[in-house]
Amino acid sequence: MIYFVGAGSGAPDLITVRGARLLSEADVIVYAGSLVNPALLDYKKDGCEVYNSAKMTLEEVIAVMAPAAKAGKTVVRLHTGDPCVYGAHREQMDELDRLGLAYEVCPGVSSFCGAAAALKAEYTLPNVSQSVILTRMEGRTPVPEKEQIESFAAHGATMVIFLSAGQLARLSERLIAGGYAPDTPAAIVDKATWPDEKVVRTTVADLAEAGAREGITKTALITVGGFLGTEYERSKLYDPTFTTEFREASR
């Protein structure tokens, strides 16, 4: 059996209990060495084969996993964060489907959740934003025309922008062109939940300056929106005047 396992956002103790168990049972581990914390390999058992996929192609990854699975071995494909967000695991699953090999997915803590924890922030504040947009700037991987930064910025919702720390000046321009005010709160979270995590609070207009000042060029998330401000409405969930399935309004 092959298991796609989310490694979590960085700190090794943020992997799920299931993920840690699967790592400890694996006969073969193929991990994304460019981003996964190597401390997670401490979970492996003696004799486990370990492959760093940082320099491997899709075909080479499959060439490791498929024969092992066919031989009855337990294989873990360890991805950073949660595999469903920029994890490139769909193409691997399609290849396994083609080969008739079984697999399961074990979710992980995405870096956008780790960033919120680092910021001590809530993305969905009442009367501020009830939506979170996860997106990226185009690079070597293009972005569909209908998913341009300006289009998303027009909503004024909370935005979390991946894989774009090297384009902060252009990102700032496009966010403002889309509708965010230049003084909209923003933050850069570098290596969320890692020991050397760095949080830089700034504004949309000053993203590039803040990134340059701190020497941030990659492995960072950019968060944008009023959720980083100080004003919001109290949640109805714990309001004494609000009746729920479990509690009658007290006044």
Where on the chain are the PLM-derived regions?
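Class I SAM-dependent methyltransferase SAM-binding "motif I" and its flanking Rossmann-like core
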Residues: 82-155, 198-201
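Short secondary-structure transition/capping segments
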Residues: 43-44, 63-64, 116-120, 136-137, ...
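Class I S-adenosyl-L-methionine
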Residues: 1-109, 208, 220
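A contiguous loop/helix-start segment that scaffolds small-molecule binding in enzyme catalytic cores
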Residues: 2, 60, 71-75, 131, ...
